[in-house]
């Protein structure tokens, strides 16, 4: 059965956020919590976060919860979330459905006008990440995307994948 509805979000906003965050999720199944996207929901925002230990992607989006006192978090496999975003995209609203925390079902559901998807959540805890994000920044850079990506690709050919890319402005 479908879990209880938690709220709604525009399908295109959801799909964009998932695509921006899921790329940072790990691919190593020996670390299952890192193959997932952490989803936090409160009365105003949904926060999506993913990491593979070397990079972190976080996106906050506004939504319309059914319960203004909602505080919930879940961990969903990134591949599942990407598939849900793809198949439910196309306009309209997506309804999020969550199993009650007291239940052992651990299900998340997504409902659009035409489709319904249900998935089990991942076990485990997503690592704390908020302390890694600066509360304010002192600099801002505006760069052209295509030349920047070309430079990164050239550097990637001659560097070790585990060495972070350092940018100096």
Tell me what each language-model feature is.
Residues 1-169:
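Structural preference for solvent-exposed beta-strand-turn elements
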């Amino acid at each position: 059965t479908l879990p209880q509805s938690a709220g709604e979000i525009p399908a295109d906003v959801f799909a964009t956020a998932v695509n921006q965050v899921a790329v940072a999720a790990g691919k190593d199944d020996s670390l299952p919590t890192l193959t997932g996207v952490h989803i936090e929901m409160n009365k105003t925002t949904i926060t999506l976060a993913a990491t593979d230990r070397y990079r972190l992607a976080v996106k906050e989006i506004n939504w319309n919860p059914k319960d203004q006192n909602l505080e919930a978090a879940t961990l969903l496999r990134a591949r599942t979330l990407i598939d849900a975003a793809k198949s439910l995209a196309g306009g309209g609203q997506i309804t999020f459905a969550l199993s009650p925390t007291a239940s052992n079902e651990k299900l998340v559901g997504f409902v659009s006008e035409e489709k319904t998807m249900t998935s089990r959540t991942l076990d485990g805890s997503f690592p704390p990440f908020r302390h890694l994000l600066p509360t304010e920044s002192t600099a801002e850079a505006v760069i052209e995307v295509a030349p920047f990506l070309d430079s990164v690709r050239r550097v990637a050919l001659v560097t070790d994948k585990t060495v972070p890319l350092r940018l100096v402005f």
